[in-house]
């Protein structure tokens, strides 16, 4: 890591932002924060309503940067600092009040300009901000004052701030009644109603009528005008600039009623947009409430309720039947069934006993458990999932990058078109100034990019949140999009298509001079001393069948590399190994017929081992890695989804590989591969198919996972490695979640494309009404508002995609 990168990482602070009304506002906020003195960089996460600030900035500075929409900024809640690393100056804050991504961007920009802030990064999806450097909550809230953002500390690394905040719990978010939250909108709407009543009774030109409409415009549009005028002064054009100019123009030509309608409908549109984004974020907030905040802990012989922040590694937690588990740990006493649906998406409770791992947020259904704590609260699996999902929501997907770039040029172009519509017909074609200025104002309103800007953030946040609740951790919008474009999927065999746990499938005694139990006892005594992976299957079989082997004395035990093992028992040397070993021993009864029987077992995907002496064959035992019950159905569903190329990669021999591959139904089989061979094959597949996914355990096939377009790891709930290294993790070690993830990804892509097409299409239709002069401010604002509402509702459908 170079020095500049290290500095940014050290000074990152995260803030929550309240008040974003749209994605465009988040972007504007980010831009403002970046311009703050002392801020090196900032990144807004619109989906999470957060901003990461790299550098020094106060909450006041951040709220000032967000003043255009009265954003409220709050540092994220402080978390336990175990070992200060290069990220020790990164401060995380939750931000309440983000109304749009543009506002989040503006807030990020404002935070970056704060003195003492080296960089900042807003996570709009998680409503958080990372601030790198020193900044107080007041400074951050000042940077977000344009949208009255509230900033709440979540993770503060700066020692001076830490000392003050260490014992401070994150404040509870206040539930503001609807009528209070939207009091100005309701009052302005009431004034419009009275205005139209006066218009009906007293006429359009009556002073009372005009004053009622003017009052409605001023009250309902105060926050709009505050931002709009600031933008005009700075030549910063966004949707609020368009609306401000349109309302001013309508007022100038005397269209008070329509100007007030534009203000009110725009405010309603923003409120609905904010509501939609909050609904999308709720999927992650619900994860935060899964784990209890307190746990019953035994200390010094006493059982006491302790807040999870104060529980240490090594503490003993008592979990009663029907209670949720508060912390990750290992069971030291008790047996129960635990519902892990919150973490893994599994609907069926899992049997748990001593030495089994349990996770925070899961439900203990039956027995009393004593659990030894293995992780601090911020390091639990559910905490990591929440953190990674919030980070994922903050990553800009390719579709979002396109929309952001498009919107940057779109708004100024709309203003130019509106000006041309207002000026050209009267100047060159003898048109009426009043008529065409009115048409130009309508073009400004219809050109508002609300629907375009909001579609991708809501879609990505909804999809990632839904996936997380069903046990699929997707670590970014980019991976969500790429998964939908996958043309081929490579499967590592062991632990993915198979269970990864070998079992004894066949055992046949071929000599009448020895009993079955006696022979298996000899096999077990020899395999007990072996380091071969398949030995565990034999030991497990012996335990299940109550076969004792401790009284069998083995002498001169030797491992025969690549062939098997040997040992002397009561003066006789026994051998266990491959057919090749017994061929080399020239055992007399190793016939062609016997060899064919062994090949039959091998062709069934089993590893056959022979037991005997140098004189005779006593028996044959076969061990196999059991195929998952779901593997065949998963491959079938993937083929039905249009993914024709499903390839199994394995280091097994060709016979075993072909047997398993044929059983599960993959389209291609690659056997006898080393890890490097798997990597090379993935590169070859990418060259041939373009987008390729690789699914494995995330450990021994890490190079191949990294080389694939999308790396998918199994068993994320039990292994930190899988969560941290893969692009997507199947938390419940459940392969059946893969088709769901592909379907969700494709549906997300389709909805984003449909939304963008619809939003642009509705605007083109409305703009065409300019030609005959039919476009009114009513039609303009209703088309924009309607498009925004329909786009938001369509995106929220992703929260309801089921895991079939």
From Swiss-Prot:
Query: Where is Cd(2+) 1 bound in this sequence?
Result: 22, 25
Which cysteine pairs make disulfide bonds? none
Quote the SUPFAM superfamilies the UniProt record gives.
Calcium ATPase, transduction domain A, Calcium ATPase, transmembrane domain M, HAD-like, HMA, heavy metal-associated domain
Gene3D superfamilies, from UniProt?
3.30.70.100, Calcium-transporting ATPase, cytoplasmic domain N, Calcium-transporting ATPase, cytoplasmic transduction domain A, HAD superfamily/HAD-like
UniProt keyword annotations, A-Z: ATP-binding, Cadmium, Cadmium resistance, Cell membrane, Ion transport, Magnesium, Membrane, Metal-binding, Nucleotide-binding, Phosphoprotein, Repeat, Translocase, Transmembrane, Transmembrane helix, Transport, Transposable element
Name the Pfam families on file.
Answer: E1-E2_ATPase, HMA, Hydrolase
Source species, domain of life: Bacteria
Q: Which InterPro entries match?
A: ATPase_P-typ_cyto_dom_N (IPR023299), ATPase_P-typ_P_site (IPR018303), ATPase_P-typ_TM_dom_sf (IPR023298), ATPase_P-typ_transduc_dom_A_sf (IPR008250), Cation_Transport_ATPase_IB (IPR051014), HAD-like_sf (IPR036412), HAD_sf (IPR023214), Heavy-metal-associated_CS (IPR017969)
Active-site residues per Swiss-Prot or TrEMBL entry: 492
State where the protein is found.
Cell membrane
**Entry GO CC:** plasma membrane
Mainly resides where?
Answer: membrane
Transmembrane domains' residue ranges:
183-203, 207-227, 248-268, 413-433, 441-461, 749-771, 776-798
Q: What is the effect of changing residue 135 to T?
A: In strain: 85/2082
What is the membrane topology noted in the UniProt record heading this document? Multi-pass membrane protein
Q: Does the keyword Cell membrane apply?
A: yes
Q: Which GO terms describe its biological process?
A: response to cadmium ion
Q: What class of enzyme is it?
A: translocase
Residue ranges of the HMA domain? Answer: 11-74, 89-152
UniProt protein name:
Probable cadmium-transporting ATPase
**Protein source organism:** Staphylococcus aureus
């Amino acid at each position: 890591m170079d020095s500049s990168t290290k500095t940014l990482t050290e000074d990152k602070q995260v803030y929550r932002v309240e008040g974003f009304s749209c994605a465009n506002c988040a972007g504007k906020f980010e831009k403002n924060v970046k311009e703050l003195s002392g801020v090196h960089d900032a990144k807004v996460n619109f989906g999470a309503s957060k901003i990461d600030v790299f550098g020094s900035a106060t909450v006041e500075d951040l709220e000032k940067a967000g003043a255009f929409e009265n954003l409220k900024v709050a540092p994220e809640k402080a978390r336990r600092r175990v070992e200060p690393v290069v990220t020790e100056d990164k401060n995380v804050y939750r931000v309440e009040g983000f109304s749009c991504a543009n506002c989040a961007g503006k807030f990020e920009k404002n935070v970056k300009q704060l003195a003492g802030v080296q960089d900042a990064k807003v996570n709009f999806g998680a409503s958080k901000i990372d601030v790198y450097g020193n900044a107080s909550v007041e400074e951050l809230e000042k940077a977000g004052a344009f949208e009255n953002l509230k900033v709440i500390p979540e993770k503060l690394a700066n020692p001076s701030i830490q000392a003050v905040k260490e014992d401070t719990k994150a404040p509870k978010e206040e539930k503001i009644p609807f009528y209070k939250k939207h009091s100005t909108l309701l009052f302005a709407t009431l004034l419009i109603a009275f205005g139209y009543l006066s218009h009906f009774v007293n006429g359009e030109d009556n002073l009372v009528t005009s004053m009622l409409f003017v009052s409605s415009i001023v009250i309902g549009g105060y926050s709009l005008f505050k931002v709009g005028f600031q933008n005009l002064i700075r030549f910063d054009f966004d949707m609020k600039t368009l609306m401000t100019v349109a309302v001013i123009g309508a007022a100038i030509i005397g269209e008070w009623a329509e100007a007030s309608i534009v203000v009110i409908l725009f405010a309603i549109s923003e409120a609905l947009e904010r509501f939609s984004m909050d609904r999308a974020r709720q999927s992650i907030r619900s994860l935060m409430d899964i784990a209890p905040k307190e746990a019953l802990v035994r200390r010094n012989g006493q059982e006491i309720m302790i807040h999870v922040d104060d529980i240490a590694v090594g503490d003993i937690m008592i979990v009663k039947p029907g209670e949720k588990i508060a912390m990750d740990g290992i069971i030291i006493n008790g047996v129960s069934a635990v519902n892990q649906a919150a973490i893994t998406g599994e609907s069926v409770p899992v049997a748990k006993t001593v030495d089994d791992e349990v996770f925070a947020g899961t439900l203990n259904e039956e027995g009393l458990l004593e659990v030894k704590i293995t992780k601090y609260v911020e390091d639990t699996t559910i905490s990591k999932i929440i953190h990674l999902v919030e980070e994922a929501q903050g990553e800009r997907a390719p579709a979002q990058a396109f929309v952001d770039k498009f919107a940057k040029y779109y708004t100024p172009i709309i203003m130019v078109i509106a000006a041309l519509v207002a000026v050209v017909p009267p100047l060159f074609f003898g048109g009426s100034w009043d008529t065409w200025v009115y048409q130009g104002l309508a073009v400004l309103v219809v050109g508002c990019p609300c629907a375009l800007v909001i579609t991708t953030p809501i879609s990505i946040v909804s999809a990632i949140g839904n996936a997380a609740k069903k046990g699929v951790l997707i670590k970014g919008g980019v991976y969500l999009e790429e998964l939908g474009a996958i043309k081929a999927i490579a499967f590592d065999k062991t632990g993915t298509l198979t269970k990864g746990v070998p079992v004894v499938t066949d055992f046949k005694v071929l000599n009448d001079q020895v009993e079955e139990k006696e022979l298996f006892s000899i096999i077990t005594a020899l395999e007990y001393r072996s380091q071969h992976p398949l030995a565990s299957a034999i030991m497990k079989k012996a335990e299940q069948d109550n076969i004792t082997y401790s009284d069998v004395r083995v002498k001169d035990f030797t491992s025969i590399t690549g062939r098997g093992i040997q040992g002397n028992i009561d003066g006789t040397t026994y051998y266990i190994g491959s057919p090749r070993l017994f061929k080399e021993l020239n055992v007399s009864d190793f016939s062609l017929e016997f060899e064919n029987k062994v090949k039959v077992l091998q062709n069934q995907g089993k590893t056959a081992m022979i037991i005997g002496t140098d004189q005779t064959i006593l028996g044959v035992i076969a061990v196999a890695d059991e195929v998952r019950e779901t593997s065949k159905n998963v491959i079938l569903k993937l083929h039905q989804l249009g993914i024709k190329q499903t390839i199994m990669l394995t280091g097994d021999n060709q016979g075993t590989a072909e047997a398993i591959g044929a059983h599960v139904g993959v389209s291609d089989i690659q056997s006898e591969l080393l890890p490097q061979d798997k990597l090379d094959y993935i590169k070859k597949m990418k060259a041939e198919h373009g987008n390729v996914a690789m699914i494995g355990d995330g450990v021994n096939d890490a190079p191949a996972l990294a080389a694939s377009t999308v790396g998918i790891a199994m068993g994320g709930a039990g292994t930190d490695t899988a969560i941290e290294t893969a692009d997507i993790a199947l938390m419940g070690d459940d392969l059946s979640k893969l088709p769901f993830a592909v379907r969700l990804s494709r549906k997300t892509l389709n909805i984003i494309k449909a939304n963008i097409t619809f939003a642009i299409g509705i605007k083109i239709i409305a703009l065409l009404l300019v030609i005959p002069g039919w476009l009114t401010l009513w039609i303009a604002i209703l088309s924009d508002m309607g498009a925004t509402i329909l786009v938001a509702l369509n995106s929220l459908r992703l929260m309801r995609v089921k895991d079939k």
